Amino acid sequence: MNISQIISYWGYPDEEYDIVTEDGYILGLYRIPYWRTDNNKNLAQRVVVYLQHGLLTSASSWISNLPNNSLGFILADAGYDVWMGNSRGNTWSRKHLYLETSSKEFWAFSFDEMAKYDLPASIDFTVKQTRQEEIFYVGHSQGTTIGFITFSTISKIAERIKIFFALAPVFSTKYLKSPLIRMTYKWKSIVMAFSGNKDFLPKTSFKKFIGSKLCPLQIFDKICLNILFMMFGYDPKNLNMSRLDVYFSHNPAGTSVQNMLHWSQLLNSTHLKAYDWGSPDLNLVHYNQTTSPLYNMTNMNVATAIWNGKSDLLADPEDVNILHSEITNHIYYKTISYYNHIDSLFGLDVYDQVYHEIIDIIQDNL
């Protein structure tokens, strides 16, 4: 099922939009405007919550569990107007006004462009469509990264964000342990040769078959689980095994090779910086300086709440501590001892540990 079909399957209303970025990418934006049994369809006064997915995932990550354990549905049931964005290059954002997806030009992007073009276009559309002055923003993983960049560099977008909820935030990567990123760094030439400098781990029929047919089988389920834990961290007791086929049928949802290389460039760094084009001359063309510029977190004044886990291989607790020290307006910070990188999406106890707290903070700030 696609995202709209998942929303409809559980009895919720859904709206789907194609929005166009300043540089011509066409992104899928999804909306759950109200909850299943709500007959009051007056949306004028509804509080808007915008959700942005992480690396190699899509908006489906917010609705992959049962309604009582999926943030997209939980927020709709709580009376909020829910919007879910998609970053360029994933399953639901692989279109462009004039570039073909088979071209290298289409895939010449990283999270720099997601922060510069995708997120501003998505938030601007959401704000105009709902006629709301401010919205609440929830990001997971890379969804927090592009939030940090956008809100620290584009003030007109930052002014629209009431509170930034950062789940498993990634900014500093000095202590990052994820084998996926480290292998990309170590085997850069192999990755580029294998992927042709275009898309990285896109959703395909073969991978969908593996996720929906093979992973549920007892002989394969441990293999699939170990792949997840190798990438994100170990926490087998907090994962809903009955939904494993759903997770794998939608993920990985793809990104660009350049985006993965960008992440690999940041290994062992305590600061987030723009993509390094590989030579002083090319950097000079793109940035008017010979090195890729750093992003300055202290320029962001958006109220920020953070949830992270001690078993997270992508958002290591030490890195999150570095990030926390640079946030000028932090309002909440919680570390969960056993959480890995995807527990804040798929954890069995995620409502108790994270989601109800998000709703409480929203209600306290209306």
Curated annotation (Swiss-Prot):
GO terms for biological process: lipid catabolic process. It comes from the Eukaryota. One of its GO terms (molecular function) is hydrolase activity, acting on ester bonds. The keyword Lipid metabolism applies. GO terms for cellular component: intracellular membrane-bounded organelle. Gene3D superfamilies: alpha/beta hydrolase. This is Lipase member J. It comes from Homo sapiens (Human). The gene is LIPJ.
